Amino acid sequence: MAKKNKNVLVRLVSTAGTGVFWVKKRNPRTQTEKLSFRKYDKVVRKHVLFKEEKIK
């Protein structure tokens, strides 16, 4: 049998309020703080800050 994966999937939601999101894997044991990336938002056609939210 395969080992149980310890990584958690999280949504990175755009702070521009467009509803665009990226999905990333995060290991909660090694990365204790919330993720935030500056990535491209297709709706506003700019790089904006994306912050972590839980996947529902």
Swiss-Prot record:
Pfam families for the chain: Ribosomal_L33 (PF00471)
Alphabetical list of SUPFAM superfamilies matching this protein: Zn-binding ribosomal proteins
GO MF term (any one): structural constituent of ribosome
Stored InterPro entries: Ribosomal_bL33, Ribosomal_bL33_CS, Ribosomal_bL33_sf, Ribosomal_zn-bd
Gene3D superfamilies tied to this protein: Ribosomal protein L33
PANTHER family: 54S RIBOSOMAL PROTEIN L39, MITOCHONDRIAL, LARGE RIBOSOMAL SUBUNIT PROTEIN BL33M
Protein name per UniProt: Large ribosomal subunit protein bL33
Originating species: Rickettsia prowazekii (strain Madrid E)
